[in-house]
Amino acid sequence: MLGLTATAYLKTQGATCVTVVEPDNKRREQALDFGADEIAMDIQSLPGKFDAVLDFSGSSAAIEAAIQLLDIHGTFVLVGTVAPSPAISLDPEFLVRNLIQLVGVHNYRPDDLQAAISFLEESGSQFPFRELVEKSFSLVDINEAVDFALREKPIRVMVRP
């Protein structure tokens, strides 16, 4: 969900080309609905270099491969690594000679939350955010909601009080 939201946000902020890498067919198609200009099944199929790469997967293998896609003065933003994961190998010379900037993002401040709310108020109707919640359950059906989420792997499930 973060990757799709970031895709939509980047497009509203004037990004000229947003490329999304997603192994899942359905989620790749959703990326187009959220403004992606290009989609790819895997990192290896991407041609060229990028000014910025944002990782929402948290996959160590994806991070190692994606960092090589950065152009000189590129920025790599790690968002999806919020749990312990395997260590990655970085080439310090590549980072230094190419003036690569690494940024880690975790949590948010109140002004970040306000900016997100403003984005949804101003641009939310341009993108199918409601479709990200695939099914809704009442709180008394919480076990069914968890089973559904584990079995179907939806982007989001809603549980109502």
Language-model features and meaning:
Residues 1-43:
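Mid-domain Rossmann-like dinucleotide-binding core that forms the NAD(H)/NADP(H) cofactor-binding site
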Residues 24-26, 42-46, 80-84, 107-108:
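Short, acidic/turn-prone active-site loops that include or flank metal/cofactor-
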Residues 60-122, 161:
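Glycine-rich phosphate-binding loop and adjacent beta-alpha segment
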Residues 45-53:
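A short acidic, Gly/Pro-enriched loop at the edge of an enzyme's catalytic core
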Residues 21-23, 56, 106:
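N-terminal Rossmann-fold cofactor-binding loop
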Residues 53-54, 77:
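N-terminal Rossmann-like NAD(P) cofactor-binding module of classical short-chain dehydrogenase/reductase
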Residues 58, 71-72, 150, 154:
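Short conserved AdoMet
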